[in-house]
């Protein structure tokens, strides 16, 4: 046998054993036909087991194989929910919006709106960072409350809406304080006014009123200062910001226009609310502090 024949035989043997090996290791995947309710129930069971990825695949299978069934409609909304559980908020919002477009009259359409709001809510950043998602959450919760005032999700939406507004108010207060530190009083006033006008139900209102009172007094605009002092004293007579404002103006009313950093509202934490006997606490006494002769 010549060398060429031996080489050919060797190649034939390699191909033969390779084919045997492949056929042995290859497992035949059998397709098992399932009804639509079987697939949907499988998806729900996986969801209950917190196997969200596999559950998502099963819901997609329902829509792919049975696109015109009632199960497909349900699967579309459940897919949006599963994406929310996977923290894929962008995909969840897209799926929920698609559901709203395809089924605007569905009985559970309010949940799709609620889910969109939740997705934005979960993405809210620290108030010192970009607040785009906070604004989207605000609009989305308001949209749900306006469209579905009797929805079972409205109560929770209102609670979360309050937290969203408080977060946005914190952002405005932070920017306003920064402007005040830089002695840019007009810019600071504009920020604090946003809190008073748009977020009056938040915990930041007393501070905003106190800072507006202080800033207007420092600018010599005593009538404007009186307005905000009146609101502060009437609504928050025992609040530390009222006590701070009174003590500040009572001790510094003749030289508030100095730019001393020690007179700014950052000293609020040093005030003890329990030891307020040193202050005249009536609103009339407070307003009298503003009876400064106009230049």
Identify the residue ranges that each predicted region occupies.
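Acidic, polar-rich low-complexity tracts and alpha-helical solenoid repeat scaffolds
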Residues: 2-6, 18-295
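Hydrophobic helical h-region of N-terminal Sec-dependent signal peptides
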Residues: 9-16
């Amino acid at each position: 046998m010549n060398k060429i024949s031996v080489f050919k035989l060797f190649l034939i043997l390699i191909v033969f054993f390779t084919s045997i090996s492949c056929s042995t290791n290859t497992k035949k995947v059998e397709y098992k036909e399932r009804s639509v309710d079987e697939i949907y129930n499988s998806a729900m069971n996986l969801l209950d087991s917190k196997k969200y990825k596999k559950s998502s695949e099963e819901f997609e299978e329902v829509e792919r194989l049975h696109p015109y069934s009632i199960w497909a409609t349900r699967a579309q909304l459940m897919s949006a929910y599963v994406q929310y559980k996977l923290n894929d908020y962008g995909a969840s919002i897209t799926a929920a919006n698609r559901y709203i477009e395809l089924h605007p009259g569905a009985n559970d359409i309010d949940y799709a709106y609620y889910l969109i709001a939740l997705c934005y809510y979960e993405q809210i950043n620290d108030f010192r960072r970009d607040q785009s998602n906070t604004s989207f959450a605000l609009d989305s919760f308001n949209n749900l409350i306006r469209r579905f005032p009797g929805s079972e999700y409205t109560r929770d939406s209102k609670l979360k809406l309050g937290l969203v507004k408080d977060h946005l108010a914190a952002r405005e207060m932070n920017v306003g304080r920064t402007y005040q530190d830089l002695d840019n009083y007009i810019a600071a006033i504009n920020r604090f006014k946003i809190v008073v006008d748009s977020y009056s139900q938040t915990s930041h209102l007393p501070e905003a009123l106190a800072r507006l009172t202080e800033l207007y007094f420092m600018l010599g605009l005593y009538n404007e200062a009186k307005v905000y002092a009146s609101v502060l004293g009437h609504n928050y007579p025992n609040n530390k910001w009222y006590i701070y404002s009174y003590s500040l103006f009572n001790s510094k009313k003749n030289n508030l226009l100095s730019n001393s950093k020690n007179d700014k509202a950052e000293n609020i934490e040093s005030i003890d609310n329990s030891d307020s006997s040193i202050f005249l606490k009536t609103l009339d006494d407070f307003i009298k502090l503003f009876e400064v002769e106009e230049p």
